[in-house]
Amino acid sequence: MAKKVIAIIKIVLPAGKATPAPPVGPALGPYGVSSVNFCKEYNAKTADKGGLVIPAEITVYDDRSYSFVLKTPPASVLIAKAASVEKGSGEPNRKKVGSITKAQLEQIAKVKFPDLNTQNLEAASRIVEGTARNMGITITD
């Protein structure tokens, strides 16, 4: 018999640096899940991805056990890293803060492809390009 799922928790944490303090503790505490054990497992799986934030989807079962799946980093984080900027523009239509090349855009689309709602790499590139445009980052050839 399969375990009964009581909650699915989505959380975004820095790779290899999760601690039981907020936001992990308050998210897992109400379900009786050990935040210390989750942090150890998360940090072990993400230790090689330093400097990125990695989303995790935690499935909590009725016997207080859990499993989690790591997602790809947010497109905005990958774009900001490629453009060497800390954050996007507050006024993306007026003020541009950086630029990335088409090759960098395609590389980011390949990384994000498993989590995007498309089966076409060209469409994935357009999705990432829209995110870059909304951050005030220009795409150059």
Curated annotation (Swiss-Prot):
<dbReference type="GO" id="GO:0015934">
    <property type="term" value="C:large ribosomal subunit"/>
</dbReference>
<dbReference type="GO" id="GO:0003735">
    <property type="term" value="F:structural constituent of ribosome"/>
</dbReference>
<dbReference type="GO" id="GO:0009842">
    <property type="term" value="C:cyanelle"/>
</dbReference>
<protein>
    <recommendedName>
        <fullName>Large ribosomal subunit protein uL11c</fullName>
    </recommendedName>
</protein>
<keyword id="KW-0699">rRNA-binding</keyword>
<comment type="function">
    <text>Forms part of the ribosomal stalk which helps the ribosome interact with GTP-bound translation factors.</text>
</comment>
<dbReference type="InterPro" id="IPR020785">
    <property type="entry name" value="Ribosomal_uL11_CS"/>
</dbReference>
<keyword id="KW-0689">Ribosomal protein</keyword>
<dbReference type="InterPro" id="IPR036796">
    <property type="entry name" value="Ribosomal_uL11_N_sf"/>
</dbReference>
<keyword id="KW-0694">RNA-binding</keyword>
<dbReference type="GO" id="GO:0070180">
    <property type="term" value="F:large ribosomal subunit rRNA binding"/>
</dbReference>
<keyword id="KW-0687">Ribonucleoprotein</keyword>
<dbReference type="GO" id="GO:0006412">
    <property type="term" value="P:translation"/>
</dbReference>
<keyword id="KW-0194">Cyanelle</keyword>
<comment type="similarity">
    <text>Belongs to the universal ribosomal protein uL11 family.</text>
</comment>
<dbReference type="InterPro" id="IPR020784">
    <property type="entry name" value="Ribosomal_uL11_N"/>
</dbReference>
<dbReference type="Pfam" id="PF03946">
    <property type="entry name" value="Ribosomal_L11_N"/>
</dbReference>
<dbReference type="Pfam" id="PF00298">
    <property type="entry name" value="Ribosomal_L11"/>
</dbReference>
<dbReference type="InterPro" id="IPR006519">
    <property type="entry name" value="Ribosomal_uL11_bac-typ"/>
</dbReference>
<keyword id="KW-0934">Plastid</keyword>
<dbReference type="InterPro" id="IPR020783">
    <property type="entry name" value="Ribosomal_uL11_C"/>
</dbReference>
<dbReference type="InterPro" id="IPR036769">
    <property type="entry name" value="Ribosomal_uL11_C_sf"/>
</dbReference>
<dbReference type="InterPro" id="IPR000911">
    <property type="entry name" value="Ribosomal_uL11"/>
</dbReference>
<comment type="subunit">
    <text>Part of the ribosomal stalk of the 50S ribosomal subunit. Interacts with L10 and the large rRNA to form the base of the stalk. L10 forms an elongated spine to which L12 dimers bind in a sequential fashion forming a multimeric L10(L12)X complex.</text>
</comment>
